[in-house]
A protein has these predicted regions:
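Structured mid-domain segments that build the active-site/substrate or prosthetic-cofactor binding neighborhood
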Residues: 282-284, 289, 301-381
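Active-site-adjacent, His/Asp/Glu-enriched structural segments that form or flank metal-binding
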Residues: 51-52, 60-175, 203, 208-221, ...
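Acidic/histidine-enriched alpha-helical segments
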Residues: 91, 95-99, 147-166, 231, ...
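An aromatic/glycine/proline-enriched structural segment found at the starts
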Residues: 24, 186, 223-280, 389, ...
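Mature N-terminal segment immediately following signal peptide/propeptide cleavage
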Residues: 24-58
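Sec-dependent N-terminal signal peptides
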Residues: 4-14
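Scaffold signal of the M16-like zinc-metallopeptidase fold and its non-catalytic homologs
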Residues: 22, 84-86, 111-116, 132, ...
Length: 450
């Protein structure tokens, strides 16, 4: 389906002189984007929502999928250790100093680890005083290459993470892990659960954690994002000076493996049961190779994703109508298009439905019927027009609220641009482009694609 959809989009945008030749979309001129000599990327933007504050992020384009078999859980463990001392801020000094200026650990100061990325953030940091700006940048610097990883802190954190593992080990997580094992069968994703396993967390050597850190926390896999009430020139100068002691990686440094999920000749069928689950649900995934990153910030990529949005909106309306009927076959359901959020090389068309108690078969039949109805008959002109108006209204709201965008919303756009290559246009250009492409779309394009 992806090849057909890609061809249709290329044909569709070919009628527009603005979109001709797979035009690369312009970047917002209000954001300063650069790359240091060591390979580290940075994004800086002045924004006063809220005034007097800024948010600071460092994105590492590595995660649990980079672990060796004897390092399972260490990407997440390393994330915890980033708050337990660094070269310039030993032990709990980072947390203590930030708390004196109103930045609270767990609320404004946080991080997360995924399969393919690790992200650290300092949100809503007051920056009227330059020393606070300097502190936040110093923390980003230390998170890049200068986490201490002291033995006593590692041993102390083992208990914290083992308790987290026990606390999180509920039916929802077990169901998620089972789904991942089936969706990504035959790849490393099948064997990585982010937090690791009890035996490994108890017994891993410090050297394993250090090896993971030194091997993968490198500047060419890192991006800084600073958005807030700051002087862009000043912040850029500070970044260049402060990050200068982070060396570029050697030519023979390890490279990330691009993991492709193999196709299967037969459908993968999985039934997961757990006495702790309170509801039954059914899901169907049609997997496909993701749109390449280099196409995302182009007119082709934009139109490709727009077609997916149209289909999701129209199918959502169908599922909502069914769920609201008397004696509906399911409580709710829908369809989503695009990334599953785990493996960057895989996309899917996903149908789902939540079943009434004892009526799982009914939910599946109704869901499958809607999938087949879409595949065989497509959509009507009326459905398309309603979806078009909904998408246009959403786009207009984005434009209307363009002067009220929070620091973290801008930051997320820039993080997505770095990680996924998604568009980063200014509000005026995006609004004009939306109107042009949405109004150019028609139901025949959608139906041919699906």
């Amino acid at each position: 389906m992806k090849k057909l959809l890609f061809s249709l989009v290329a044909l569709f945008i070919g009628v527009s002189s603005i979109c001709a030749q797979m035009m690369e979309l312009p970047l917002d001129p209000e954001v300063r984007v650069g790359k240091l000599e060591n390979g580290m990327t940075y994004y800086i933007r002045h924004n006063e929502k809220p005034k007097g504050q800024a948010s600071f992020y460092i994105y590492h384009d590595v995660g649990a999928i980079q672990e060796e078999d004897d390092q399972q859980g260490l990407a997440h463990f390393l994330e915890h250790m980033a708050f337990n001392g660094s070269v310039n801020l030993p032990e709990k000094a980072m947390i203590e100093q930030l708390e004196t200026i109103g930045v609270q650990f767990g609320l404004n100061l946080n991080a997360f680890t995924s399969w393919d990325c690790t992200e650290y953030m300092i949100k809503d940091c007051p920056v009227a005083e330059e020393k606070n700006l300097d502190l936040a940048l110093l923390i980003l610097h230390d998170w890049s290459q200068f986490i201490s990883l002291q033995d006593e802190e590692i041993d102390s954190e083992r208990g914290v993470i083992m308790e987290e593992l026990r606390t999180r080990d509920g039916a929802g997580l077990r169901a998620q892990n089972d789904m991942i094992k089936n969706l990504f069968k035959g790849t490393l994703y099948e064997h990585r659960n982010l937090i690791g396993y009890l035996d490994g967390l108890k017994s891993f050597e410090r050297s394993s954690l250090v090896n993971f850190y030194k091997k993968w926390y490198r500047p060419e896999y890192q991006a800084l994002v600073i958005v807030g009430d700051v002087d862009v020139d000043q912040v850029e100068a500070k970044i260049k000076a402060l990050m200068a002691d982070i060396p570029a990686s050697p030519a023979d440094a390890a490279q990330k493996e691009v993991i492709m999920v193999p196709a299967t000749d037969e459908p993968i069928i999985s039934v997961f049961t757990d006495k702790e689950l309170t509801q039954s649900s059914v899901m169907m995934f049609a997997r496909r190779e993701a749109l390449p990153k280099e196409y995302q910030n182009t007119s082709v990529g934009y139109s490709y994703n727009l077609i997916n949005s149209f289909v999701s909106v129209m199918m959502g309306a169908r599922f909502d109508e069914i769920a609201q009927a008397a004696d509906a076959p399911f409580l709710g359901g829908g369809m989503s298009e695009g990334s599953i959020g785990i493996c960057p090389t895989l996309e899917s068309t996903m149908f789902s439905a939540t079943a009434h108690e004892g009526r799982t078969d009914d939910a599946f039949r109704a869901m499958y019927t809607e999938m087949e109805r879409m595949r065989r008959h497509g959509f009507t002109a009326g459905e398309f027009e309603r979806a078009k108006q909904e998408i246009l209204r959403w786009s207009e709201r984005q434009y209307t609220n363009r002067n009220d965008v929070h620091n973290d919303s801008y930051a997320q756009r820039y993080l997505d641009h770095y990680a996924k290559g998604t568009p980063m246009m200014d509000a005026e250009t995006e609004w004009q482009f939306d109107q042009m492409v949405i109004n150019q779309m028609n139901v025949d394009v959608i139906n041919q694609a699906y």
